From Swiss-Prot:
Pfam families: LapA_dom. Its main location: membrane. InterPro entries: LapA (IPR032906), LapA_dom (IPR010445). GO terms for cellular component: plasma membrane. This is Probable lipopolysaccharide assembly protein A. Keywords: Cell inner membrane, Cell membrane, Coiled coil, Membrane, Transmembrane, Transmembrane helix. The keyword Transmembrane helix applies.
């Protein structure tokens, strides 16, 4: 519960900082990208680039998280299979003795 409250507080702090920065940066700048050129307000450009960075970070994190989850599931299956084999071997050994 504390983790969620802390996350909400951090999110609100980031939003407040973004609003403050956006309110103070209203100048128009020219943004050149590979295909074209556009004019943006500095605050809008910062918000767009921040959002793209956030989305890219989440996608990269999700990729590695899913990769680790799949590896964890495979290892759990392997442990279960080996546990069954050990139990089977000890059962057959006990029957022989």
């Amino acid at each position: 519960m504390i983790k969620y409250i802390l996350g909400i507080v951090i999110f609100i702090a980031i939003v407040l900082v973004a609003i403050t920065i956006g309110a103070n940066n209203d100048q128009i700048i020219t943004f050149n990208y590979i295909v074209a050129e556009s004019q943006f307000q500095l605050s809008s450009l910062v918000a767009i680039l921040f959002g793209l960075g956030l989305i890219l970070g989440w996608l990269i994190t999700a990729f590695f998280y899913i990769k680790l989850k799949l590896k964890n599931m495979a290892l759990a299956r392997q442990v279960k299979r080996q546990t069954l084999q050990i139990n089977e071997l000890t059962t057959t050994r006990d029957k022989v003795v």
